[in-house]
Each structure stands twice: as structure tokens, then as C-alpha cells.
Design a protein with these regions (language model features):
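Alpha-helix capping at helix-to-loop junctions
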Residues: 95, 99, 159, 187-190
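Generic structural marker for isolated residues within well-ordered, non-membrane alpha-helices
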Residues: 178
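Short, glycine/acidic-rich beta->alpha junctions
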Residues: 135-136, 170-175
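Short connector loops/turns at beta-strand edges and beta->alpha or beta->beta junctions
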Residues: 63-64, 157-161, 195-199
């Protein structure tokens, strides 16, 4: 039987007491930042990212605590930071290239959205964060642009290479989300850019949201609010749906109790 020599070099993370202490300083600072982010109060609003499940948004509006609190995870935080960097890079490139055809989201809302007087708009770099009071919704817009004589909503998604490489259409879990964004902004056309976080590859898919879909989306928002006011849970996802799991839904356990 042959024995392999262990390669302990892969386990080495520091080479002196000073480097050990400095590594601990870096990791402690990172953990503190993540914990502070996790401790921020959760808003009782509809989240378009959960638009595929009315019941999940019902729990959010009711202020129900998730099944288990979030814990510090440097891996997830790093992935989020990489995703943010990808967004910022693409947004900067597109703004510089499109010039006047890269639209001011705040101005577009003021001109085209009837709920403008009932919202707050914050600019974070080239991302626009929007909070509406009625119905209570918070969302972020990656961009609005004029392309081929149409107004398009831009949505940027990032993923690992293996997931990105197999994409031939928008991921189903993202469609309800972008449909919500488009409906809120009353925009019928969407360009979805998917970027591989490892090598930077890009794919782009177009979606069209009909006026009927926009109306149905708004009706759903108001229905969820009405059910939350009455403390009556709407229907959740059908049995067997892959998104109805403890890993995908923060209210999976509580959902079974309601």
C-alpha cells in the first residue's frame, strides 16, 4: 500500500505571530461588518426577488421572523461583493457608451410613474433604490436605457461559471422578479445580462412584458397587502416546487404551520 505525503503548505495561512494577529484582525473586522449588516432591521415590504411566492411576501409584510437568523458567512459576503463589482463595471461601461440613451431613473419615475409622490428615491452609484409606500415595496433598478427606439429596463445577474455556461434563457426564478420591476416602472421591454463571475463572460436575453401582465402584477401586489391586513395567508407554491425548500425560503418551516 502506497502512502502519500501530506501537503501541509495548503493549510498554512500565516508564517509568524505578527501575520497571525493581523489575519485575525482582518477576519474579525470582516465578521463585524457582516454581523452589523445582518442586524439591520428588516423592512416590512414586498420583495420583488420573492415575487414567485405570494406567501413569502405575506410573511414579510406581517413582520414574521425567518425560521432561523442569518449568520456571518464570509463566502456569501464575498460573492455579493464580486457581484456588486460586476454590476458597477457594466453600468459604467454602458453609461459611457450609450451617453444620453442611458436614462436618469429618478427623472423617468417623476415623469412616467403615477406613484412618484408616494416614493423615496436614493442613488447609489449607478444603481437607483426605490421605496414605495402604497403598496409597500422596495426595489433597486440597475438601469433604464433607450435602445432600438424602445425604453428597456436593464437587469444584471451574476453567477458561477457552471451555471452561466448552461444558460440558454433567463432563469425561471428571475422572470417574476424582473416582471415586477418592469411593472412597477411601467416598462414593457427588458434586457437581462448574465455575467460569469469567474471569467467575465456575458450573455444577454430579451423579455417583453405585456400590459396585461403589468396589470396582473399590480393586482397581485394589492392582493398580498389586503391578505396581510386581514391576516389571511395567500396560497404558497404548489407541492413539489423546487423553490419551496428550507434552502430557498426563509419561512419554509413557518409556512407549513400556516
Amino acid at each position: 500500500m502506497a502512502f502519500r505525503t501530506a501537503d501541509f503548505s495548503r493549510l498554512v495561512r500565516f508564517n509568524s505571530a505578527n501575520s497571525c494577529d493581523f489575519l485575525e484582525l482582518c477576519e474579525s473586522a470582516w465578521d463585524k461588518k457582516i454581523a452589523e449588516d445582518d442586524a439591520k432591521p428588516k423592512s416590512r415590504t414586498i420583495a420583488p426577488s420573492s415575487a414567485y411566492c405570494m406567501k413569502q411576501n405575506w410573511f414579510r409584510l406581517r413582520g414574521v421572523e425567518p425560521d432561523k437568523p442569518k449568520t456571518s458567512d464570509r463566502g456569501l459576503d464575498f460573492t455579493a461583493q464580486v457581484g456588486t463589482s460586476c454590476h458597477e463595471n457594466l453600468q459604467s461601461l454602458l453609461k459611457a457608451t450609450l451617453k444620453d440613451d442611458w436614462l436618469d431613473v429618478g427623472e423617468f419615475i417623476r415623469t412616467n410613474c403615477t406613484w412618484y409622490s408616494d416614493c423615496e428615491i436614493e442613488q447609489h452609484g449607478l444603481e437607483t433604490r426605490i421605496a414605495i409606500s402604497n403598496p409597500p415595496i422596495r426595489f433597486a433598478c440597475d438601469g433604464l436605457l433607450r435602445w432600438k427606439e424602445e425604453i428597456y429596463l436593464l437587469e444584471i445577474k451574476t453567477s458561477e461559471f457552471s451555471s452561466w455556461d448552461s444558460l440558454t434563457a433567463p432563469k425561471p426564478i428571475h422572470i417574476d422578479q424582473v416582471k415586477s420591476y418592469a411593472s412597477l416602472l411601467h416598462v414593457n421591454h427588458v434586457l437581462m445580462i448574465y455575467q460569469d463571475r469567474q471569467y467575465g463572460g456575458l450573455k444577454c436575453f430579451e423579455l417583453r412584458i405585456s400590459d396585461e401582465e403589468i396589470k396582473a402584477t399590480w393586482d397581485t401586489f394589492y392582493y398580498i397587502v389586503d391578505m396581510a391586513d386581514k391576516n389571511l395567508p395567500p396560497k404558497g407554491l404548489p407541492s413539489g416546487d423546487s423553490r419551496c425548500s428550507a434552502s430557498m425560503c426563509p419561512y419554509h418551516k413557518k409556512c407549513k404551520e400556516w
